[in-house]
Amino acid sequence: MNTARLNQGTPLLLNAVSKHYAENIVLNQLDLHIPAGQFVAVVGRSGGGKSTLLRLLAGLETPTAGDVLAGTTPLAEIQDDTRMMFQDARLLPWKSVIDNVGLGLKGQWRDAARQALAAVGLENRAGEWPAALSGGQKQRVALARALIHRPGLLLLDEPLGALDALTRLEMQDLIVSLWQEHGFTVLLVTHDVSEAVAMADRVLLIEEGKIGLDLTVDIPRPRRLGSVRLAELEAEVLQRVMQRGHSEQPIRRHG
């Protein structure tokens, strides 16, 4: 795997995207632009449409209406450039760690798989079985499995939700460092607002199928845990999430 930084990630443009399940409107004419290489976190209450948005971008669902574009190209036409991680690492227990990383690949892929494992600190576990790994190590393997494809877009659906606090912080740092190195676009869905503001360039709140808050995280990297500014931004997002009344227009907070 070439570990040189990619020229850019996948730029995303959603135009009036809606998703309905019978009478249930999950996404409601949602408009969104994400520049190439941006790290975006999505927060919100359960059922607000966060995971549905990720599934649309992953090609696991199709929109009821609207366009999902990578620049000017339908995202579905370049779906091979998109990879997704879930809360469950989804490793095949009957395959070794390195075989899980190279799943579905053909040709001479083992050197690339070893490089991907080295990037996540698990090169020495290549020949082991998934059962021998901790939860955090399994998620590192899942991340390596995404990296080997050199994605333009990495979708993260609560990938750290089941990890202990220390392992979660280590994984946050790893994901951010790999994003900085490779330049892919990241969309992270999380229920943890502190995680969102610690990792992302931008935090979106989705409520009632629309964007209710669009917040730029104006803190340089590396970010210091416990900083006053991080706490202020976290409080701002939490306050908005907890509001019962909803304005017609999204609230934007930049810089």
UniProtKB/Swiss-Prot annotation:
This is Aliphatic sulfonates import ATP-binding protein SsuB. Keywords: ATP-binding, Cell inner membrane, Cell membrane, Membrane, Nucleotide-binding, Translocase, Transport. It is found in: Cell inner membrane. It catalyses: ATP + H2O + aliphatic sulfonate-[sulfonate-binding protein]Side 1 = ADP + phosphate + aliphatic sulfonateSide 2 + [sulfonate-binding protein]Side 1. SMART domains: AAA (SM00382). The complex is composed of two ATP-binding proteins (SsuB), two transmembrane proteins (SsuC) and a solute-binding protein (SsuA). ATP binds at residues 44-51. Residues 12-233 form the ABC transporter domain. One of its GO terms (molecular function) is ATP hydrolysis activity.
